[in-house]
Design a protein with these regions (language model features):
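Glycine-rich phosphate- or other oxyanion-binding loops that anchor nucleotides, phosphorylated ligands
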Residues: 1-117, 124-165
Length: 165
């Protein structure tokens, strides 16, 4: 699992803002730290407490899907700094930031990407690995809730929206 701290958005057809519905208010949201640093640290701490190994940083590449990526796309994502590739997580991270909501992502790694493994990618492999990791992920989420209940998050997630009317 990786507690991602950055993302690259390669989606094309998803709604990506709350501020495009003809609102008089337009927002320009700082995405320097797209995931709440305080919440990320809470997740890392919770993982450590239950001895679940996590990668504490990582750049998530969100691809449109539903197809898997080509080997050339994976190579490009690597060159751009991507560590993990998936089809979820964007636009949620952007929308959470627009609302000033603390948000973080836990990436469960389910398979080697195209070109990094000798056998073809299959959805069955992804489902099997997710099933195998389900208990560990559930335990981590429950521990996060316990730690969050005993913690105070003092971040700037709600302070970085600049808009114009």
């Amino acid at each position: 699992m990786a507690i991602i701290d950055q993302f690259l958005d390669f989606t094309k057809q998803r709604p990506f803002t709350f501020f495009d519905q003809g609102d008089a208010f337009r927002a320009h949201v700082d995405m320097t730290e797209p995931y709440c640093p305080e919440l990320r640290q809470l997740i890392i701490k919770a993982a450590s407490m239950i001895k679940v190994p996590v990668q504490p940083i990582g750049c998530y590449v969100c691809a449109e899907g539903p197809r898997y990526e080509t080997a050339a796309e994976i190579k490009m994502y690597q060159k751009l700094g991507g560590d993990v590739v998936g089809m979820t997580g964007v636009p949620e991270v952007v929308l959470a930031r627009e609302l000033g909501v603390c948000y973080s992502g836990i990436s469960t790694i389910t398979n080697w990407a195209a070109g990094l493994n000798k056998h073809p990618l299959t959805h069955q492999e992804v489902v099997a690995v997710m099933r195998d990791n389900q208990a560990k992920l559930r335990e981590l989420i429950l521990k996060c809730l316990t730690v969050a209940g005993q913690s105070s998050i003092n971040c700037d997630c709600g302070q970085n929206i600049e808009g114009e009317s």
